[in-house]
């Protein structure tokens, strides 16, 4: 089958079109980053102007949004991707035959252990924390690449300012374009198969440490089903790197989407009016405070008082022509108008609104009564309910693609041998993070309540319950690994051994035969 290979000019054109569509979000994202994530703000010319180390909080007067955004990212990470913990489980899908499911699940549990051992060796916990900060604005982007023997996988959180993308079928992100700067001498180190044109090579030899503007493009080949990877030198429009890839290394996640848009809108966009209002109110309060301290004065033009040399400070003597009389004072304070005490009420309301939108509703302080496990679970449940559809989108657009790419890299490096696909039918990714488990525990409680009702209904009720399947379901909901559970074959063997022992006891003590038969009937109904 013929492969699709775009020319460098075509890639640059598509990149410009994608950037033009993204410009519609520039003013919206710019304000969100300026007031809530100023340290990650690249929209105010800091990147284009190549200015590093600049102050980015000149217009920020209140840090409520900054603090709540950080707490939002921390809560999302602890609830969905808890550091140094397992946050998902690989499970056998519906395409796996029932008689092979226990065997497949045991192997997948081993792969799950190896996957999280690999993740712990990487920078995942740091990278996902930074990516979730961008997700609070609306769109986060992460690059998953093979590493070395020490760090098998590298996770790179890319600021979404540098990335433009295109959607394909079913609203999935297919093509990703990234602007990047790299020292000329590092190009061949970054891409060992780079083909540098003569003009660029000469420029690098003269100025090896000067940054080179590059466009990195990952384009989906709709005919072959794989990806084309290009690195283009923007100035000369020369293709430096071209590769074919089985999968895209990009993970692009949107918190929430509006119909007809491809970029996300996060809780910061919702809270932005309150954030800007709070910032302006506090700015006015500070200005009012400075007026209250220093004051504003009127001075008579009498030739004695020189306003340009007057210093308002404790202990200073100001020479004036008069302090009263028919003509009035030479220097007189200008009375202030307005009462800014009401601003405290307004600011408190605005801060509460911002924290509520950003899910920054903390547990009670440590000096209050001890928090029970039930309270923590209920608060996790409330958090998952508040997230709503965003939680499902995070699983589908972030967790599942991440796991898929991690397993593919591990398979390529020989860490595992994975003949199955992560498609939900052969292998499915089941979240076991605290947020997901809070939902599962609701199901477990319902199952156990039903079992209690059945037990109270007597023998007829017990005959309706399949105890072994019930316990399997509870174990799956609680993410109990297959290695500590007996398989169907092992259970059948244990039943046969128990039946033989019961038969032997019945032969030795005939008076117990009736009891054994009754118990066997009861067990048969329950099992």
List where the protein language model places each region.
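Extended, helix-rich architectural segments
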Residues: 1-199
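C-terminal anchoring/interaction modules
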Residues: 1-41, 45-46, 54, 297-527
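Structured, contiguous alpha/beta core segments that scaffold functional sites
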Residues: 10-11, 16-20, 145-313
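Short, mixed-charge, low-aromatic patches
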Residues: 63-74, 83-89, 98-101, 229-237, ...
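Short, Φ-rich (hydrophobic/aromatic) sequence segments
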Residues: 68-80, 111, 115, 123-135, ...
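Residue-level detector of secondary-structure boundary/capping sites
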Residues: 102, 106, 269, 345, ...
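A broad, structural surface signal
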Residues: 109, 113-124, 133-137, 202, ...
